[in-house]
Amino acid sequence: MEVHNVELQISAVRPDQYPEQGYPEIALVGRSNVGKSSLTNTLINRKSYARTSSQPGKTQTLNFYRVEDQLFFVDVPGYGYAKVSQKEREKWGKMIEKYITSRKELKGVISLVDARHEPTDDDITMYQYLRYYDIPVLVVATKSDKIARGKWNQHESKIKKALDFDGSSAFQMFSAQTKMGKEEVWKWIEDRMGE
């Protein structure tokens, strides 16, 4: 998709704040600082539209980015950040669960993991949770440029094994630095939009 028009429509914490246009929605989930904002910026051809931060836990709302008046990217708060209080994590968890399990416009979830490391327990839990609810998932392994290309298959295999990856999901290595994987991610998104 050629992207020219993007707007942060709303940062929501409750269903009554969600957009009402009925556009397909693609949620981006992953632990704090895994690269959700960097992926979003790469997909929409912007350097810093979605705010990136070296401070984990920056996103605390569901951020609905309207793309070309055709779909929404929904940036979800990162999980697994220890400096956020347990109460705050529980609040985010309920907000995310309500969105994922009840939003009919949600057509798929891009679950980001760090390509350099095996998935965390939180990554595994999120992936299994999405599969349990039969939500289409694209696992995107970010920061792939930090790994020698000859080791990508090895890292992909470790990630898939840890997630107990199944054939109904898709997988893509990705780098915001080199834009590698951008077209494949867009293809997956466009396929979901047609469903």
Swiss-Prot record:
GTP binds at residues 30-37, 57-61, 75-78, 142-145, 173-176. Its cofactor is Mg(2+). It holds the Pfam family MMR_HSR1. GO terms for biological process: division septum assembly. Residues 22-195 form the EngB-type G domain. Belongs to the TRAFAC class TrmE-Era-EngA-EngB-Septin-like GTPase superfamily. EngB GTPase family. This is Probable GTP-binding protein EngB.
